[in-house]
């Protein structure tokens, strides 16, 4: 028969919390499990992910592989004819600078492609060679 005093809690999450700095017999007295001196013994210290005690970390020991072209790629954005209708007046000049001033495109953008979506009611002047028109937009401009 099981005695009442022999019953154990089945769940390990109700484990007793570690009492720190409560004398040598507790097992966590004096330095409270932090050891002597060094960064880890100081308050507020958090070890950075990947830190290996001052040695060269793994991510620097492993050789790099491949090449990313992301830094050198030209930033291209799309803009619709519908949006151009909202932004520009009739007879206005469309250029990268004009689009950047109106905050339609990002300042790092080097090319823009105009895509046909909705009508283009206004007659616009295309100044920049960096603005590429889709076939649908070209046919729409010729019709106007």
From Swiss-Prot:
Superkingdom assignment: Bacteria
GO BP terms, alphabetized: translation
Pfam families hit by this protein: Ribosomal_L27A
Region annotated Disordered, chain positions: 1-48
Gene Ontology cellular component list: cytosolic large ribosomal subunit
Keyword Ribonucleoprotein among record annotations: yes
GO molecular function: rRNA binding; structural constituent of ribosome
Stated family: Belongs to the universal ribosomal protein uL15 family.
Known partners and oligomeric status: Part of the 50S ribosomal subunit.
Function of the molecule: Binds to the 23S rRNA.
Annotated PANTHER family: 50S RIBOSOMAL PROTEIN L15 (PTHR12934), LARGE RIBOSOMAL SUBUNIT PROTEIN UL15M (PTHR12934:SF11)
Protein name, UniProt field: Large ribosomal subunit protein uL15
Source organism: Chlamydia trachomatis serovar L2 (strain ATCC VR-902B / DSM 19102 / 434/Bu)
């Amino acid at each position: 028969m099981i005695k009442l005093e022999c019953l154990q809690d089945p769940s390990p999450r109700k484990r007793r919390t570690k009492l720190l700095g409560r004398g040598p017999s507790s097992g966590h007295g004096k330095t409270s499990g932090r050891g002597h001196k060094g960064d880890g013994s100081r308050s507020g210290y958090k070890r950075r992910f990947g830190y290996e005690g001052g040695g060269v970390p793994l991510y620097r020991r492993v050789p790099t592989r491949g090449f990313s072209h992301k830094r050198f790629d030209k930033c291209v954005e799309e803009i619709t004819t519908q949006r151009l209708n909202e932004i520009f007046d009739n007879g206005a000049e469309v250029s990268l600078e004009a689009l950047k001033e109106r905050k339609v495109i990002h300042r790092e953008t080097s090319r823009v492609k105009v895509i046909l979506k909705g009508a283009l009611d206004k007659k616009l002047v295309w100044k920049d060679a960096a603005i590429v028109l889709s076939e649908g937009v070209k046919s729409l401009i010729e019709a106007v």
